[in-house]
Amino acid sequence: MLRNIFRLICLMLVLSFSFSIVSCREQVADDDMIDQPIVLNMNTEYKLAENLPEGNGQRVKVILLLGQSNASGSSIVSYLQKNSSKQDFARYSAGYSSVLINYCIDDHNVCSEGEYLPVDLTCGAAEGFFGPEVGMADALAAAYPDETVLILKYTMSGYSLHHHWLSLGQRGSIYNAFLIFAKENMEHLEALGYDARIGAICWMQGESDTTQAKADRYFDNQSAFVSYLREDLEPYAEDGGIYFIDAGISNGPYCEPGYPTVNEAKRRFSELSPLNIYFSTIDAGLTTVNEPEGDPDWGHYDALCELELGRIFAKHVIESYRER
């Protein structure tokens, strides 16, 4: 028991330290390098699934989960267990055989090695942490009990849209690495005989764009970003197009001073197309202030809130399929 507690404390220290370093680094980049290109050396060697049966023409829904650490999964499993009923936690732990996830987190730091695995509580940024895929799977499995849903998760904790997903408004290092991941997996699904279509992109990002200079550019950056996504992924798009489901960021101290500007940019962008969906995590009551008790991790959602984040994503995914 003590060993597990010590391990949890160590993991929290690592994540918190990493978040602080990135935040400080981004402040410097914002002041001194806002209009300078930044190139990351990304690993684009992706393994392809060997655990899927032949598709034989089976139609499958594919959902992309993209963003930074709250998409990676930095919420604490032990608090989810503490605050859930035994029946609910048993369901989350057992996983969802009809909702499979292939994930690459933080440039292969944590990944499924190309395999599609049942979503459970082990798909987060580190051992003992989970992401929004759990709430997504809980809702998607209930909505589509006789179907297989695939989640492709590609996230980079602590990196900005302005400097890293994009660079000077063009496709940047993270975007290009993600695109290889997505294309190779979609082509592999086709080669296995699946009729796989991307129906929605769930985007949980913006915390690292909250220096005011980056926040002021978020609307233009997101407009470019989503146009690239739809252009590059068009061959794999579901009938009716790819929905972009965009979560607002929190109003916690790590999102000062620019979170109102970022969230307003997200809201404005959602008005440009019926395929763009925005929801406010602040209005939804999602908090970052309670866990761990006594020393909260202000950057990441409390466990039940991370679960709800995934459920809200799934709600909009389900509604998007009804509207096609």
Where do the model's predicted regions map?
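Intrinsic low-complexity, intrinsically disordered segments enriched in polar/basic residues
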Residues: 5, 18, 30-32
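Bacterial signal peptide processing site
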Residues: 25-27
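Cell-envelope and extracellular/periplasmic
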Residues: 30-324
